[in-house]
Structures are given as structure tokens and as C-alpha cells.
Amino acid sequence: MVCDGACVDVMSDEAHCGGCEQPCAPGEACTAGACVPQCDEGTVLCAGACVDTNLDVAHCGGCDVACDSGDPCVQAQCDAVDVVHLLITGQSLSNGYSSAVVSTMQPHGNLSFNTGVRAGAMGLTGFIPLVETWDGAHGETIASGMANLAGNLWAAAGFDARTFLVSAHGVDGFNYSKVKKGTPAYMTGMAQVMAGQAIATALGQTYEVRAMTAIHGESDHIDYPPEGNPGYAANLVEWRADYEADIQAMTGQTTPVRFFYCQVSSWTAYGSAHSLIPEQQRMTALANPDRLYLVTPKYFLQYTDGVHLTGEGTLLLGEYYGKALRRVYLDGLPWAPLGPSAAIINGVDVVVDFAVPVPPLVFDEVAVTNPGNYGFAFSDGSGNPPAISAVTLSGPTQVTVTLSGAPGPQARLFYAALGQPGAAGGPTTGPRGNLRDSDATPSLAGQPLYNWAVHFELPLN
């Protein structure tokens, strides 16, 4: 067609869309002679609007593919599973050793086996409401905090709370070699999966195992002196892969089994200034961002004995797992904690950029006492490194550590990674730092679930 003295294709020309002098508005494209929204990368045009088919409940996985009311769209699939099983493994912290019972009521529809959270492998014949119990040595686990906070977050987003079945099968004091595939502890976990699917099926419900969670690593520090198991990173990867392979073979599910775990934060209680375990936990999650998730460190929580958490501390830790579950299973995005993303030396300044879930960064000396320099330390291999003269927030996602002189060639920055041998773990004594973000996600008790910076050590050259 001739418009303004020129031949134009009115089927695609944005100045003459469908006819001469019929321009499309800014942000619209001319498609088949009609002005339609020009969709950004990652979205598609459905019913005249740009939508993300990975998350849109009306167009889940494609246009006009709607999820049932109350079900979210996660990674282009409607999440309608009736019973979602979350497994807990590890050692005494995973079993709630010395943690007083806090969670005695079930606010949602979350479940345990009839034998309780620490379910064992025998007599698993039904489901009961998820609450915590005391067995003479163990009480509150992360189960209730994790599942109940997740339920709150699902409801706050406008969806039906998922029904989480949670069961623990860790063993006090066991390092990885004693809980890995082939051990009685591992087989107890598989027995719980088999029973979970059988009971759900008998009730006419669909069932999947979504995640294995762990509180672990302390014994892999103790049993491999002086600083811990150097192969722990490979153990974490193997651990998850074994769970996924065996669970998928057993249940027939194709959904991946993701691994959520926290950092060891109490190695000083065992007489060590430094541990190899926390950095391996951090780096393994960074190397496997779609399957392994480091949830949080534990230095800001309250402890009973410098190693084990109080009931309130365990409940709070569980809520951090619940927050990570929401990120992965409702938002459909990888979880990453507050941690460093880049660091450079600029004269006497070490400038560290952080991946911050919710900016801005804050130095909090109320929840955690300042161990000196907000938890930062510096070494350069010289035996006489320059001292830290200042630590400042140089941006909403940046920290600058200023040294007293030029660093040597083996410069290394530490955060909450060095402590006093013999010191109890915790917010006033253990290896710790004061750096957190501004996440206002409310806990079950109403306080904000700030993300605290993970233990880390960074080579700078």
C-alpha cells in the first residue's frame, strides 16, 4: 500500500499498521496488521498481553493453559501435587538435640508420619498433623518452622498452602561417611519415602519428594583434624545425586530432588580457629546453583551449649529454609544467600561487591556483637599483613575494607571465618559478623528474617 508517497507493508509497519496513518503506540509492534504489545525477552503475547509463561497461572507453559484455582505456576508447570515430602538429614542439630519444643500446634495442613518428625523406618502407617515433640534428648527440629513459614508465604502470595510432609532421619554425631548411600541412616530415609508414597496413594493423593534438607558438617570438621574434611564439597554433590537417583527410581517422579543446607558456624567450640567446611559449603552451592542451595549461616542464632541451638533458634533456622523453599518452589528461581560476588584491591582499599537478596546492606551490632571490624579479617601471607583501619558500607550492596598499607601478593579477605579456639558458637562469642541485608519477610513470631552474610574467604590476587 502507498502511504505518504511510499510503499509500505501495513501488516508490519508500525507507522501504518493495518492502514495509512495508523501508528502503533510506543512499546507496541505491528503484527498481522494489528498493534500488539512488544514483549520483552522471557515473555510471550497471550490474550493481548505480555506474560511470563513460567509463572502466569492463566498461561502456564503456554497461552490459555490455566492452573486450577489456588495452584501456582512454577517453571511452566501447574503445581498441584497433594503431598510434598521434605526430608531432613544430618546429625544432632537435624534431630533437635537439646532444643526445647516450641511448635505444638499446626496452623496449616502440614504433616508428619504417625511416629512423629523423627519418624524412623518402622511402623509408618499414616499421617498426623505436624507438631514437635520431646523424646528426652531431642525436641524442636527445623520441620515446623520450615513447613509452617512456607505455608504462610504461599498463602500471602494468594495460593493454597502446600501440604508438606516432613520427616527426619539424621543420626547424632555422624559424619558424611556414616549417613551416605548404603548406610542405615540413608536407608531410613528411603523407607520414609516408600511409606510416604504408599500412604498418599492409599488416600487417593498425589505425592512427590521435592527436597532433601540437612544440618550437617560439624562431625566432618571434628573427625578430620585439624581443620576438617577436605573432600566435603564432593560429598555434598554425591549426597544429593544419590538421593535424587534413588527417589526417582522408587517413586517414578521426574521432578528433581533439590538440596537445602546451612553452614557450620560453631567450629571454635571444638578448639579450632578455622574450618575448611563452611567455605566448601559456600562454594559447592555457587557451583551448582540449580540443585544445591546454601540457606544461611547460623552464627546469629541462639545456642544452648555453643554447638546446638535453642528451641527458638531451631524454629527460626527452619523458617530460613521455608523462605528458601518459597524462592525455589513458588517464584521458580534459584535461592542464593547474602554473599560476595566480586572483590578488587584499589590501593589500600579492598572493595567487595555482594549479591544482596534485599538491599541495602546493614551492619547490625544489636543482634550480633561486633567481634572487631564487623567480622572482616585480612591476610597476605607475609606474616605481618597490614591491619584493617576501617570497614565501611560504600554502597547499598558494597563494603570497602581499608588497610593500613599496601597488601602483599597473597592477599586474602575473610568474613566470619576466623574465631577464638574454644569459644562457643553464637552471636556474642563464636566466629561471626555483623553484615546483613534488609529483608523484611516476617517470621512466624513477626520479626524480620534478615539474610546474614555467609562465612567466606576470598583470594584477592
Segment roles from a protein language model:
Residues 81-461:
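Cell-envelope and extracellular/periplasmic
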